[in-house]
Curated annotation (Swiss-Prot):
HAMAP family in UniProt: UPF0346
Family as reported in the entry's similarity comment: Belongs to the UPF0346 family.
Top-level taxon in the UniProt lineage: Bacteria
Name of the molecule in the record: UPF0346 protein Lreu_0775
Family matches, as InterPro entries: UPF0346, YozE_SAM-like, YozE_SAM-like_sf
Record NCBIfam families: PRK13672.1
One of the Pfam families matching this protein, by short name: YozE_SAM_like
Length: 73
């Protein structure tokens, strides 16, 4: 069974890291409205653009999404 993007992102958490994807994961953990079951790029991207003040650049999401795709293949 394929994991959701959120489930993958939680594997990237590291509160002591300066890596932007890991910081994104740390912040998403505390986002109670994050679409936790989604595997859809457009749905998650739209959500982040509208709601994620903790994400300074969408290029961080793009990098995290690429890591997700690589891990799922």
């Amino acid at each position: 069974m394929r994991m959701s993007f959120y489930q993958f992102l939680m594997t990237q958490r590291n509160p002591n890291s300066a890596d932007e994807v890991q910081q994104f994961a740390n912040n998403a953990f505390f986002d109670t409205t994050f679409p936790k079951h989604s595997e859809d790029f457009d749905e998650i991207s739209h959500y982040l653009e509208e709601n994620a003040d903790y994400l300074p650049s969408m290029t961080i999401f793009d990098e995290a999404w690429q890591r997700y795709i690589d891990a799922m293949n």
